[in-house]
A protein has these predicted regions:
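A detector of single, family-specific signature residues
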Residues: 1-169
Length: 169
């Protein structure tokens, strides 16, 4: 009885995995058919699935007039942390946006910091600057913001990624 139940669950799991693989392939085919996919995938280290999630969460890019709208949609804009006359030094991101988009950007930035020299330099610069150095997580948040601005510019101006354009050196 136990072996039969176990075999049934294994078969069900394998069937679901194959269904997920088919759905994932269909998603990637649809994503690659979009003209915006070319520009998003030109960023080294940004995978097709992550780029597809970002584009799916954003929707039609032509609806947005500037990168700040994408940033607000993701909920990664910094918000002042004040109460009355008190101003705390830490400025968190708002988190009032799409969590899935924020998560995709977070993992994309982690990968880019490891693989892209320009992002790695910018990450170090945020942490080591003399005035207002950022913690590791704050630097990642700032890079999420920067990545979304770059992606917006690539899609808006129909350009491929240039590691020296838009990042300080």
């Amino acid at each position: 009885g136990l072996q039969l139940a176990l075999r049934f669950h294994i078969e069900t799991l394998e069937k679901r995995q194959s269904q997920m693989k088919v759905a994932q392939n269909a998603l990637l085919e649809n994503f690659l058919a979009l003209p915006e996919s070319r520009y998003l995938l030109s960023v080294p280290g940004l995978g097709a699935i992550t780029a597809a999630i970002i584009l799916a969460e954003i929707g039609d890019p032509s609806r947005y007039h500037n990168a700040r709208q994408w940033i607000k949609l993701a909920g990664i804009q910094p918000v002042p942390n004040t109460s009355g006359r008190k101003t705390r030094s830490r400025t968190p991101m708002s988190h009032k946006g799409r969590a899935r988009l924020r998560t995709a950007l977070y993992f994309a930035v982690l990968r880019l910091v490891q693989t892209d020299e320009a992002f790695a330099r910018e990450y170090q610069r945020f942490q080591q600057r003399e005035h207002n150095p950022l913690t590791k997580m704050q630097a990642l948040g700032a890079l999420m913001n920067r990545l979304l601005r770059i992606l917006w510019a690539l899609v808006r101006h129909q350009r491929l990624y240039d590691p020296h354009y838009g990042l300080t050196t």
